Amino acid sequence: MRALWIVAVLLVGVEGHLLQFNKMIKFETRKNAIPFYAFYGCYCGWGGRGRPKDATDRCCFVHDCCYGKLAKCNTKWDIYPYSLKSGYITCGKGTWCEEQICECDRVAAECLRRSLSTYKYGYMFYPDSRCRGPSETC
C-alpha cells in the first residue's frame, strides 16, 4: 500500500495536498518525504499497524489519527491555503476540511523536526511484515 503513496505523489499533475505536505516536511526537516519518510517505520507512508517504532514513527501515527478524525474530508487530495515564512508554517483560511487537514500536516511536520535527532536510518525502508501486533488507540 505504501507504494501507492509514492505513485500518487509522482502522478499528481498540479500541486495536490500530498505535495503540500511534502513541502511542509522539507521546510521543517530539510529532508524530502521521499525517500526519508515514505517507508519509515510502521506508520509513515500509507496505512500502518502495530506499535510505532520510535519518535519519528509516532509522529506519523499521530498524523494518521488526526486524519482519522476527518472521515468526511478528502485528506489525501484536498488543497489547502498555507504559507512557509519566517521559520513557521501558517495554515490559511479555507473550508473547515482544508483548515483541519492543514493543521494535521503542520503538526506532523513540526513533530518530525523535533524527532530528527532520533531518526534511525534502519527504519527508513522498514518492511510492513515486521509491523505486528495490535495498533495503539488514537
From Swiss-Prot:
Does the keyword section mention Signal? yes
Single annotated GO MF: calcium-dependent phospholipase A2 activity
> Has the keyword Transcription regulation been applied to this entry?
no
Q: Which UniProt keywords are given for this protein, alphabetically ordered?
A: Blood coagulation cascade inhibiting toxin, Calcium, Disulfide bond, Hemostasis impairing toxin, Hydrolase, Ion channel impairing toxin, Lipid degradation, Lipid metabolism, Metal-binding, Neurotoxin, Pharmaceutical, Presynaptic neurotoxin, Secreted, Signal, Toxin
The residues the entry assigns to the signal sequence are 1-16
Q: Which reaction does it catalyse?
A: a 1,2-diacyl-sn-glycero-3-phosphocholine + H2O = a 1-acyl-sn-glycero-3-phosphocholine + a fatty acid + H(+)
According to the record's subunit comment, the protein's assembly and interactions are: Heterodimer of one of the acidic (CA1, CA2, CA3 or CA4) and one of the basic (CBa1, CBa2, CBb, CBc or CBd) subunits; non-covalently linked. The acidic subunit is non-toxic, without enzymatic activity and comprises 3 peptides that are cross-linked by 5 disulfide bridges. The basic subunit is toxic, has phospholipase A2 activity and is composed of a single chain.
Name the chain's protein: Phospholipase A2 crotoxin basic subunit CBc
Q: Which organism is it from?
A: Crotalus durissus terrificus
